[in-house]
Amino acid sequence: MDEKFAENCKVKTGIFRNAAGGLNYYCSYIPKNPIANVVICHGFCEFAEKYDEVVEAFLEKGYAVYLPEHRGHGYSQRECSDWDKVYIRSYDDYVQDLYCFIQRKIALKQRKTFLFAHSMGGAIGAIFLEKYPTIFDAAVFSAPMFGIRTGKCPQPIAHLIARMACLVGQGTAYAAGQHGFDGKEDFKNSSCTSEESYQRIFKLRNECVAYQTYGGTYQWLLAGILATKQLLKRKNMKKIRIPVLIFQAEWDHMVKNRAHLKFLIGTRQTSLLRIEGSKHEIFHAGEAQREVYYEQMFSFWEEQLREETAVMTEPFLEWQEKNDRVITRKVWQRNETKINETRKVLDLI
């Protein structure tokens, strides 16, 4: 991380006991007089150091940042002997680990606490908000995994294959199309739009065995499909009580964008912003896209800091242009009279 940020904040790394009693790794970055806390819930096959650019952006605005590594990722406890593989029994394990971290490492009463969750972390974060609706004050989901893209194989078939594989004792085997880290660069098929960001992350992964977690197992796939079904149940979505902002990437080949609209319909304080010209990792998009991304994110959080209850009810569908290069589509919170309009938007996104 850039030394100027390390000099102006207290940087700490450590371990905490997860819900199973194992040891998970975390980082925290506390500036002087922080305005609020941000907990980063990272995505599939990621690690804390990958988020250095995001952490720097948050620190510049005065936020204290907490970043735990999920079980089976980075330096945290592994449940599979092959460190290239991602294995989890249930997403509830991720959720309970996050709860343990927050309870043990963050003083919630000192200041407001926001959630920033990306991809798989979005699924974990959504389930967390449904189970613990009062811990966070607001949440930002960046390209959240509310629906998994399973390539040419329809999800119902992928679900069946994963379930059968687990039943016959192949839960720790790589799911079809998944594999270990091979040390080969592949920017074209990556989730980054910025090649500079891709090269930085690839170098980190290539140099550290703990960062080479790379492919999902059948048990991880099964758990992920079940998690997305769980979080999108109407009775569960209704439990979310806080303002939520979803960022959606135009060129997302990892998650289903249509699932974001289901979440929008099922919750009451959710807005959605689509970033044109971005791949899955919006925080590693081009400069123009990232400018819009952070501008809108910080504006959202600042609104929560100004008001005890911030409910967005302004235009249902609105367009924005930025530098003639980035077009963002903002879908605001729906009310009961606009559900049909929301469903029509599904054909546009």
Region spans (language model):
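N-terminal cap/lid segment of alpha/beta-hydrolase-fold proteins
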Residues: 1-30
